[in-house]
Amino acid sequence: VPPTEEPVEEPEWVEPPISADGRWIDVDLTNQMVYAYEDDTLVASFLVSTGTWMTPTVTGQYHIYVKYRSAPMSGPGYYLPDVPYIMYFYKGYGLHGTYWHSNFGTPMSHGCVNLRTDEAAWLFEWASVGTLVNVHY
């Protein structure tokens, strides 16, 4: 392609959308809540349990990088078979269903975001690999 005779202005940079479909997840550690958004519209909210002070949930902006309908989870001092609806967003941190407790609203996890299984199922079907996960206090 031959060069133009006159310089062309640099195109204006536009921030990319949160995801192709505008969906994103907000994890509020202070209030132990997860919010599902489509652009600026809240479409669902869930009471959750996140990490304890000894095993805190990471903060920052991440993207779901893999989803498992069911898989085992383990770490120092625990093994949990068949954990439902896992969506990992950073290393071993994820959102998932929880069958071993129902104490939602209280930090109890090893760093993951624990949801009721039926609510985790909804979020799992709604979100995609690549969906933004914003985690904050």
What are these regions (language model features)?
Residues 7-22, 42, 52-61, 66-137:
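Exported/periplasmic cell-wall-interacting domains
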Residues 24-26:
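Short glycine-aspartate micro-motif
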Residues 1-5:
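Extracytoplasmic intrinsically disordered, low-complexity "stalk/linker" and propeptide segments
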Residues 28, 34:
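Gly/Thr-rich phosphate-binding beta-strand-loop-beta motif of the actin/hexokinase/Hsp70
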Residues 45-47:
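Residue-level detector of high-confidence beta-strand sites
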